[in-house]
């Protein structure tokens, strides 16, 4: 077996499949593009779904890739096992309706065992297969594999919901008896026993059925085009090739671990407790790549996952004695390890470091808040005479504040308490189940559409014309290919078309179709790309249409031009975002509609009013400069040399279209654009908002819609000016400021009057002092207009020695407001209010010296006042 670096293993994989006629697909962003079903790209095949379900037919049906992926449904196992990771690389080879079982097995065996390639010892390889899949068994036998090395496993059938499915055959590497202390042997495979001896290195899925959850597996229909989908984990392959005990002792992780050793002063013990080193090494890879791809830490979705990973790694850093932000210092090491295939980490190093360091500092503050929350829990339990921190509270400390269970148990032990570990684990399992359920939701591929896949006629989109005459080549009606259609809805393909198919965020053209006599025969309501790439026109048929006939196709010119203005403005906006916010503000999605444009981009905070003003100003200046728009078709390498901005994660063919706006913007784009920026007229941002962790959205309008938006604002300002009796709009701010000052003065006078009234009333309230359990207290109902007046009463009470405890109740509207205050350490106002509030169907809490509660049962106010003595 050859000794190789991880970079050499990856490259050998790609080189081998290239010799078998496979196109090498580049790794795409971890953040899925145009796939809302996935939180992350979680496999090599996730980026190829449209090929497998037949939505798109690839140029080359043979594909190979090395794809970075993230799976986080088993975060807690990372660091505990030899092979669990959050981020990993999946090596794959795929056949879309081309070769099948025989070639897949033959070539896999060749790559693994040939001296020219990996040169694995043949006697170290074991294969599992689906019991009913005799063809795979026979093919392995034909390759020379011993029958004793072929294990039938009932679970070797791949399916996730509806769509492509089929048996799979897995390849394992036997690391020997040293990893099998009980000498169980091949039974470890037969009985699916977790072990470190037989390492799964490759799974070959033979996708030959359209799975249908409504019928038994035996009734699944054969796919019209059978596929091969395989996955081999790079980390596992490298561990086997480098003879590492675990994946972490390979060149993919050890440089990171060495850096952690330097930062901590601790030494990684291969055979000892090294979990913290492993967690940090794994999680910093995920953080570096995910943030580099535009995901940012937050409270939901991808952001929540990243925040969890960072906090877990940070806590493990503390276990190693690192008590300051340190994870950001590991980013350069991650970048250097991966730069041969993934240069983006080093390219975005400064930004990634900034985000991670900021999040580490924020977590330090959160930990402090968590410490306060933990102290409150302990104090409340002591006050109630209880000694067990609930599983829910322990989980909240873990989930919200990042406290590992062990830290909560230490806090409990110091207070002579324990933690409900079973309750914590139950809450944890609920969360894990939710995570796993979300993973399954996104796994299914759609059913293959045989009719559309079978249409292979050539059709071209003409950028230069808005109307032309072309032959009708295909008609699909009621999911069948037909020669003619007379009424209803149909899908049409022409030899050539001026209609733009929806793509790249630009909506489709609408328009009309005429026959040779000039009669209107169909209305075009949508245009999409067919599986083989042809523009597919959805039409409402108004008169008979037949194959082989020529028709005049004419787009809605006004609609097209309005969309073009918005699309060109989107390019200007993208460039302005880079200039104002930074290069990290890259496109995360866009929509170029008729009446507006919507642009999603990565950014770690809300865009300020000043920044929005600068962005809007810059876009308009480029419009007024009347910059010419030029388009050129070239190869991808030339486009990159031109400085074209490609959307990370998008797939581009050999030939690409470059759209240049003066010397201001250069982007790869297949959409339609105006000839000069002056045609846009004017650009206006109407809204900026967050749509998810680390992702912002700008809604903007151009031309007529922008003018109308400005007019609406002007009319609103005129109305305000009239109300304020301002002669001119520009005087409105001054008038508003004057009103605000008047309001502040009135509020001040009102507050002073309330204080005087409270002081006068308090003289009566504070006279009624009672005794209970050695404490003096006042419990009274007062008449006030708001809860703030209760605090005024309390402030007056604090200034003199009226009593040890004060409880005030007020009926305000249909609600009940309660205040408790204490001057003695023996009575905790927050705990007292928690016991009193339920009497009026309320709840509340607060500090030891003052607390508030709200309730709704006014009839129970006398009961609450009567209960004060008992609670004391």
Curated annotation (Swiss-Prot):
Q: Catalysed reaction per UniProt?
A: tRNA(Ala) + L-alanine + ATP = L-alanyl-tRNA(Ala) + AMP + diphosphate
Q: Which Gene3D superfamilies match?
A: 2.40.30.130, 3.10.310.40, 3.30.54.20, 6.10.250.550, Bira Bifunctional Protein, Domain 2 (3.30.930.10), Threonyl-trna Synthetase, Chain A, domain 2 (3.30.980.10)
Q: Does the keyword Calcium apply?
A: no
Q: Which InterPro entries match?
A: aa-tRNA-synth_II/BPL/LPL, Ala-tRNA-lgiase_IIc, Ala-tRNA-ligase_IIc_anticod-bd, Ala-tRNA-synth_IIc_core, Ala-tRNA-synth_IIc_N, Ala-tRNA_ligase, Ala_tRNA_ligase_euk/bac, DHHA1_dom
Instruction: Name the coenzymes or cofactors required.
Output: Zn(2+)
Its Gene Ontology cellular component terms are:
cytosol
Q: What is this protein called?
A: Alanine--tRNA ligase
Record text about domains: Consists of three domains; the N-terminal catalytic domain, the editing domain and the C-terminal C-Ala domain. The editing domain removes incorrectly charged amino acids, while the C-Ala domain, along with tRNA(Ala), serves as a bridge to cooperatively bring together the editing and aminoacylation centers thus stimulating deacylation of misacylated tRNAs.
* Cofactor comment: Binds 1 zinc ion per subunit.
> Taxonomy-wise, where does this protein's organism fall, top ranks first?
Bacteria, Bacillati, Bacillota, Bacilli, Lactobacillales
Q: Identify the species of origin.
A: Streptococcus sanguinis (strain SK36)
Alphabetically ordered keywords of this record: Aminoacyl-tRNA synthetase, ATP-binding, Cytoplasm, Ligase, Metal-binding, Nucleotide-binding, Protein biosynthesis, RNA-binding, tRNA-binding, Zinc
Would you identify the family this protein belongs to, as annotated? Belongs to the class-II aminoacyl-tRNA synthetase family.
